[in-house]
From Swiss-Prot:
GO molecular function (one): structural constituent of ribosome
Record-annotated disulphide pairs: none
Protein family according to the UniProt entry: Belongs to the bacterial ribosomal protein bL20 family.
Keywords: Ribonucleoprotein, Ribosomal protein, RNA-binding, rRNA-binding
NCBIfam families tied to this protein: rplT_bact
GO cellular component: ribonucleoprotein complex; ribosome
InterPro entries: Ribosomal_bL20, RIBOSOMAL_L20_CS, Ribosomal_protein_bL20_C
GO biological process: ribosomal large subunit assembly; translation
Native source species: Xylella fastidiosa (strain Temecula1 / ATCC 700964)
Known role: Binds directly to 23S ribosomal RNA and is necessary for the in vitro assembly process of the 50S ribosomal subunit. It is not involved in the protein synthesizing functions of that subunit.
Protein name: Large ribosomal subunit protein bL20
């Protein structure tokens, strides 16, 4: 049986890892063993970051809605409750966008929420 050396596959695998490690400093870029660990850790951080991004944006939207609601005399929770009772099905992302770019429109939504809460 012939001996298998795997030279081509190993070089290809090393090149792939080292190309993923571009932009890293010192041995993390040049030494395969260190670069492989750095790339694996970077991919873990990227995976975690994609989950955290969703949480961070949701909290940002809530902060923006809360600030705009308080300018109209409502707390965030009472505003959201009033919006829900009105049957307005805007998500937090859209409400935050309206709060930032169209304050008059948000005021109209807040007034509707107030009327539903008063009733």
């Amino acid at each position: 049986m012939a001996r298998v050396k795997r030279g081509v596959q190993a070089r290809r695998r090393h090149k792939k890892i080292l190309s993923l490690a571009k932009g890293y400093y010192n041995a993390r870029r040049k030494v395969f063993r260190v670069a492989k660990q750095a790339v694996i850790k970077a991919q873990q951080y990227a995976y975690i970051g994609r989950k955290q991004k969703k949480r961070n944006f949701r909290s940002l939207w809530i902060v923006r809605i809360n600030a705009a609601a308080r300018m109209n005399g409502l707390s965030y929770s009472r505003f959201m409750n009033g919006i829900l009772k009105c049957g307005i099905t805007l998500d937090r992302k859209m409400l935050a966008d309206i709060a930032v770019h169209d304050p008059a429109g948000f005021t109209a939504l807040a007034e509707k929420a107030k009327t539903m809460l008063a009733a």
